[in-house]
Swiss-Prot record:
Pfam families: DivIVA. This is Cell cycle protein GpsB. Forms polymers through the coiled coil domains. Interacts with PBP1, MreC and EzrA. InterPro entries: Cell_cycle_GpsB (IPR011229), DivIVA_domain (IPR019933), DivIVA_fam (IPR007793). The keyword Cell cycle applies. The keyword Cell division applies. Gene3D superfamilies: 6.10.250.660. GO terms for biological process: cell division; regulation of cell shape. Residues 32-69 form a coiled coil. It comes from Streptococcus gordonii (strain Challis / ATCC 35105 / BCRC 15272 / CH1 / DL1 / V288). Divisome component that associates with the complex late in its assembly, after the Z-ring is formed, and is dependent on DivIC and PBP2B for its recruitment to the divisome. Together with EzrA, is a key component of the system that regulates PBP1 localization during cell cycle progression. Its main role could be the removal of PBP1 from the cell pole after pole maturation is completed. Also contributes to the recruitment of PBP1 to the division complex. Not essential for septum formation. It comes from the Bacteria. Belongs to the GpsB family. Residues 57-78 are annotated as: Disordered.
Amino acid sequence: MASIIFTPKDIFDQDFKTAVRGYSKQEVDEFLDDVIKDYETYSALVKELREENSRLKQELSKRMQEAPNSTASQVHQSFGDTTQTTITNFDILKRLSRLEKEVFGKQIQASELNQL
């Protein structure tokens, strides 16, 4: 892409030399050619930025539509994992309770018999 030659201040401050019949036609033409190039560059840049802006808006819209679906499936999957973990933990606690009753229950019964 072509680079921008003039700033607005450059255009404002441009002075043309006067010739016999006014300004030098060649100098004015060269300056205006450069101004036209700048405007074409600005126009192309604006067009490119508008296209990029439009593309990014579409991408954002698409992601916003996909986000609730993916979030819901992640929550459901996470809930399923949590439920499975809870069931596993509960099963372990039941087994531990039975084991404690078996081990400590005999000790409690033995101590009760000793007290009698």
